[in-house]
């Protein structure tokens, strides 16, 4: 396993543990005497005014639209690297996790629609259980230390990256509301400039980020979700230049600690604080949260494992070396941890609707993700080999 992937896995695992702490603090604050402090923090007004440009939003939306764009920038960099040189480079490496990820998105969405397909409003949340939170999943996996084979970690990483790419496409196609053609036109010009810079071999990361900032503002104003700007910029930054530098790798290396230890935990803190006041058992067991929880806990492993098994049996893909189907099933349960990505989609799906929909959707996400984490961890403990003693070389 390359040093890049090894470092990535370490940071994601540690970041996942911080995510858990941030979410727990948010839940405690939202259901204690500190609820007012918590809400006031999220409602802090933040404005940027440059000439005729005026962007005014509460802190919560700056986190969701701004900081999450940085997260998606890193996702774009990761996906490009893995497609060109990493665990997804070449057909043989990419097919197995790609098919698994496809099943892991389709089955949860279909199960959700079985619960909520008849309701025009809640139907909009069909993509909520389709997401996997890679940081959380790797954080749980890290609890088992060196018992986890390297190939299994890389499989989870590749599957989650493809899953992220699928979620990005879903956001672009299904969660875009009113569109400003003027802003989209300027955004298209910015994308064309980024593509030209890439073609000409421009290696200055700052130049891409400056154009990317313009792109972010244009996409934000266009009505398309602004986080997509991050993905586009990530794909446009060169992986290598003529002088053998890697602007993409350098930026990813610099961003990763900020994303793992600050941006995602801050997003979790800002969005996981669900007030349980007024929440009833009948509401918690209603179709919306049950559809999400069932989609995550049942749909994810059903889709990932079934599609993986069929791909191998039909000769479409090969099972990675030193991995068996018991381990694949355990990891597929772990992929039911949707958390940050699912909460992000829920905020888009039910934006401007009854606040109760967002509340119960988050509760469904927490229920499904927690169950998947506990059961997935327990299954991994059963199917993985015994602890391997570390060998010190002197």
From Swiss-Prot:
This is Na(+)/H(+) antiporter NhaA. It is found in: Cell inner membrane. One of its GO terms (biological process) is regulation of pH. It comes from Yersinia pestis bv. Antiqua (strain Angola). It is a multi-pass membrane protein. It holds the Pfam family Na_H_antiport_1. HAMAP family: NhaA. It catalyses: Na(+)(in) + 2 H(+)(out) = Na(+)(out) + 2 H(+)(in).
């Amino acid at each position: 396993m390359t040093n890049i992937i090894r470092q990535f896995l370490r940071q994601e695992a540690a970041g996942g543990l911080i995510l858990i702490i941030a979410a727990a603090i948010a839940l405690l604050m939202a259901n204690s005497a500190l609820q007012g402090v918590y809400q006031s923090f999220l409602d802090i007004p933040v404005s940027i005014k440059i000439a005729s440009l005026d962007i005014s939003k509460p802190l919560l939306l700056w986190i969701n639209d701004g900081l999450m764009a940085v997260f998606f920038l890193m996702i774009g960099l990761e996906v490009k690297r893995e497609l060109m040189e990493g665990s997804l480079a070449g057909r043989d490496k990419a097919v197995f996790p790609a098919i698994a990820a496809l099943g892991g998105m389709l089955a949860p969405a279909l199960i959700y629609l079985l619960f909520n397909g008849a309701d025009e409003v809640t139907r909009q949340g069909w993509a909520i259980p389709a997401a996997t939170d890679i940081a959380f999943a790797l954080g749980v996996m890290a609890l088992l230390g060196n018992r986890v084979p390297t190939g299994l970690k890389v499989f989870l990483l590749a599957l989650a990256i493809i899953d992220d790419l699928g979620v990005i496409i879903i956001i672009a196609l299904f969660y875009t509301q009113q569109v400003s053609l003027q802003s989209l036109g300027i955004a298209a010009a910015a994308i064309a400039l980024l593509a030209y810079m890439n073609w000409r071999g421009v290696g200055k990361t700052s130049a891409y980020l400056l154009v990317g900032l313009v792109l972010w503002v244009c996409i934000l104003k266009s009505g398309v979700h602004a986080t997509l700007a991050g993905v586009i910029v990530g794909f446009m930054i060169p992986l290598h230049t003529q002088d053998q530098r890697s602007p993409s790798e350098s930026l990813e290396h610099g961003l990763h600690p900020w994303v793992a230890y600050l941006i995602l935990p801050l997003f979790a803190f800002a969005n996981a604080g669900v007030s349980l006041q007024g929440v009833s058992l009948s509401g918690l067991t209603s179709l919306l949260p049950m559809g999400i929880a069932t989609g995550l806990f049942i749909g994810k492993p059903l889709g990932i494992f079934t599609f993986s098994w069929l791909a191998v049996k039909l000769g479409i893909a090969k099972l990675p070396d030193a991995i068996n189907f018991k381990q694949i099933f355990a990891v597929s349960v772990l992929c039911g941890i949707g958390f940050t990505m699912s909460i992000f989609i829920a905020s888009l799906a039910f934006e401007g609707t009854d606040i109760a929909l967002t509340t119960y959707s988050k509760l469904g996400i927490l229920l499904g993700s927690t169950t998947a984490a506990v059961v997935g961890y327990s299954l991994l403990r059963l199917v993985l080999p015994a602890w391997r003693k570390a060998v010190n070389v002197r």
